[in-house]
Amino acid sequence: MKCFNPHLEILSEVQQWVYPQLRNLKDLGFVLYGGSALALQLGQRQSVGFEFFLHGRLKQKLLRGACPLLGDESLVTQIQDSENTVTFEISPPDSGKGIATISFFGNLGYGRVGEPRLTEDGVLVVASALDIFATKLKGIIQRPSTEDFADIIRLIKSQESLLEALEAASILFGTDFSPMLALKALSYFDELKPPLSQVDASFLIEQVSNTLKNISVRNIERPSLSVNS
């Protein structure tokens, strides 16, 4: 597995406090996705939460064993609890640090396209930019947000291909994903709050137009989320 030097400076103060306590999660097969995964790789937009995905079923006893912090009721409040989704809100001893959330999603059997990467300090396994891109394209169809649009723009500007991300999402999510609906969603941003800048809006329109000329979907093997599982 390739390593990268994470942009820890982009994390909030409370996330930096939590970060080293997440080291054992990778041994259970957890892979970091979402805005924080992207921020660690690109060093740009700050995200206040960690989102961990797991290929298999979520087992809370093992989860709490790997991350004892989650069992400290003086610091942690569980705000969501379902069979394969749990979310915790963390307030460190120094309340001035703020609050962070950690979410865990299990039984995500759709696999991956890119190769996850390990932070050089050995703390986290992080999803590839392509896989994060694919999940964000699916997300904007259902729940468009300015944050996801901003992340997609950053991904494209960091040389990630919109066309390849559409192909990846089509393979990962099958009939639950429509490339054309994703492109339509990328072209409809008038109701986003806060709104996109005119520069970003024009950039997206140009990218969608260029992609429409070349869109296609290829078959790609779907291994599990983690390299070791």
Locate predicted features.
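Compositionally biased terminal segments of proteins
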Residues: 1-229
